[in-house]
Amino acid sequence: MNELYTANIALSVFAMAIMLFSLRGDISQSKIRNLLCGGLYATITICALCEWSGVQMDGTPPALIPLHIAVKTIELSLAPLIGLFAGCVIHPCPRKVVHRLLCLAGFHALLVLLSAFTGLMFYVDAQNFYHHGSLYPLYTFAYMGSMVFFLVQIWFACRAYQYTGGT
């Protein structure tokens, strides 16, 4: 089963690398859209690799605990950005909205970073196994909030191109 999981992650990372490289010569899109797409692909890649690394590190020697904590911190901090990047790629957002969302994402990342030291959102035990902390629902809320934002952006994009029957 682990080989299948590893192959799935490897294929996902490979696909994201192809998408990142395809942006380099794309002059048909605006610079900001290319930047958002690049951020989306890079974030998905980093999160996938961190998630895979965290799974692989479960139960490894205790000397790897700091690395395990760092990997989970990166993963949990960046994952909510996926929905934000994807939403902004699907339908343009006003700068104010983007700045507010990035501030919320930064606050979430700060909470995850604090959790690396306190264990409130997640912790790694003495046997180097990852566990959810008492405030893990905050991460779930942030991730689901970014997915709701993405769905709302899809709705706005559909509305923008909807034919109303007028002239």
Located regions from the model:
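Short juxtamembrane and helix-loop transition motifs at transmembrane-helix boundaries
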Residues: 1-3, 62-70, 130-135, 155-166
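Extracellular-loop-to-transmembrane junctions of the mid-late helices
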Residues: 2-11, 110-156
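Hydrophobic alpha-helical transmembrane segments of multi-pass membrane proteins
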Residues: 5-28, 32-62, 68-86, 101-119
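Alpha-helical transmembrane segments in multipass membrane proteins, preferentially the mid-helix core
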Residues: 16-23, 84-89, 140-165
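Transmembrane helix-loop junctions in multipass membrane proteins, especially transporters and channels
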Residues: 27-28, 56-63, 91-96, 116-124, ...
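Cytoplasmic juxtamembrane regions at transmembrane-helix boundaries
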Residues: 99-106, 163-167
